[in-house]
Amino acid sequence: TSRRQRQMCIRDRKSEDKELYYRVRDAVGEIRKYVTDKLGCQIIDNSLLIKLEKIPVIPEQFMGIGQFSSKEEYVYLCILLMFLEDKDAQEQFILSQLTEYMTAVMPGEITDWTLYNNRRKLIRVLRYTVEQGMVRVTDGTDDVFMDDAGGEVLYENTGASKYFMRNFSRDIMEYTKPEDFRESEWFEVDEDRGLARRHRVYKRLLFAPAVYREDGSGEDFEYLKYYGYRLSEELEQLFECHVQIHRGSAFLLSGQDCRMGAAFPENNSLADILMLAFGKIREKIEGKVWKITPEEMSLVDKIEFESLILDVKKEYGSGFAKLYRDMPEGEFIKNVTDEMERWMFIKKVDDMHQIKICPLVGKIQGSYPQDYTGGNENEQ
């Protein structure tokens, strides 16, 4: 199997790209052997789709569903999956059947479809399930429901929804806290040794932008200490990337030809703003204004950090896209810090009103050319 085949995103729906589906299907034996051995992940392989179940070691800020912005949308998704569970593949249903089912399962304000916000959230969930190939629109447009609770749309169940949720090794009704979901397959296994430790290290490197010693087991960095060179060679050969291991952090940096997942910086204005901010942060740290802890972190007062973000806007704002030039200060700070947190550049320590600056900030920064005079006022 070629390296390109190994790099494929193992979540190909046959109906969308048959050629890619069959290419992955031909290579799935070797891919399954690798991900089972190194990551402890399972592959679902059937006539509908091929999916790699990527279960993280540590839930991170960026791992939610990006299209969702509220808890209610996750509730709607779970009830929708319950609704589809009773439907056959290719079975059709109209939107009012779903809304009536949801109201019966969870009566109250959350399923009051006369409220525009509820309708908007449900449509966002349905659009997500369409994107994921769980349902398809057969007739109509969801805008009519957005405008009026009586609006109808005809959907078709593809049968793929039953493979969306993770299969747990234990009855989750026994769980009492979020931590119970973490790595439930390692229940009653010595997690700091052998196979489980290797799976943790590979997952943390491949599924997140950064690995920090303080976040997980210290045994993970012991593994990197002894096996890091061999692991680096292997991943660099397979995925066209470069692994860097430090005292308190480790990173998988994508190469120019790497096609594995999302990468920073993305080609957008917000990424440019972050890189400009990183340059300012670096100046503070190199100037000993902001101190570094033994774990390679820097703990800064939240107000002081937000002041730096605003300084970046004041100094470089003329070169920003119009959206960010005109954005109110509070909204600008939130957009920038949320994006930094999403990529694991910072952690918000809300109970202490502080920002923890992580080592990944030191890996990248940006600046405008010295002769740059500002942005185009006509830019949209």
Predicted regions and their residues:
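Single conserved hydrophobic/aromatic residue that forms the stacking wall/gate
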Residues: 1-10
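Short acidic, hydrophobic short linear motifs in intrinsically disordered regions
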Residues: 11-19, 89-111, 206-218, 291-324
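A short, conserved structural fragment
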Residues: 40-41, 126, 130-141, 239-243, ...
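Positively charged, polyanion-binding regions of nucleic-acid-associated proteins
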Residues: 71-94, 271-299
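Internal, well-ordered domain-core segments that constitute the primary functional module
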Residues: 82-155
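Short, amphipathic alpha-helical interaction segments positioned at domain boundaries
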Residues: 146-199, 360-380
